[in-house]
Regions:
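Short, solvent-exposed aromatic-acidic interface loops
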Residues: 41-43, 111-123
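Short, surface-exposed binding/anchoring microloops in extracellular/periplasmic proteins
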Residues: 1-34
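Mature extracytoplasmic domains of secretory-pathway proteins
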Residues: 39-85
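Extracellular or exported targeting regions of proteins
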Residues: 70-84, 94-96, 100-103, 110-112, ...
Length: 131
């Protein structure tokens, strides 16, 4: 059976201001057969950090692998714990979060989602992966 590789990345320099939670539900014949969970918590919500933590990882990209099914649903939660550095909305535009899914070596989903710096985002991505 083919493997799915789920990748989530951003080049946003202030991504340290956000916690990230990812869940992936894999279905076969309409039944959930696997649930993957990933959590990257930098600080508690409301922390209002003044600078990037010294232990912040160089590459905070997400890589998840699982066996393919018929369908994949991704739940991606980008949760701000520290407000944007600029207090004016016009100077804190949305940033890109790239999500891609490969089945074996074939790319079956690629999209750049825009993330609001003030509120973060809750993304739900449904993909037919075909076995």
């Amino acid at each position: 059976m083919a493997l799915l590789t789920i990748s989530i990345d951003t080049d946003f320099e202030e991504f340290w201001r956000y916690n990230l939670v990812v869940m992936a539900s894999i279905k076969r014949d309409g039944e959930q057969v696997e649930l993957l969970k990933y959590k990257s918590e930098i600080a508690p919500v409301g922390a209002e950090l003044s600078a990037k933590p010294s232990n912040y990882p160089e590459d905070r990209g997400v890589r998840l692998k699982c066996e393919a099914g018929d369908a994949l649903t991704l739940y991606i939660y980008v949760i701000p714990h520290t407000l944007p550095s600029d207090k004016y909305v016009r100077y804190a535009p949305p940033y890109e979060l790239s999500v891609s899914v490969k089945r074996g070596n074939s790319n079956i989903y690629t999209h750049r989602h825009m993330i609001n710096q003030w509120s973060g985002e809750n993304l739900v991505v449904d993909i037919q992966t075909e076995r």
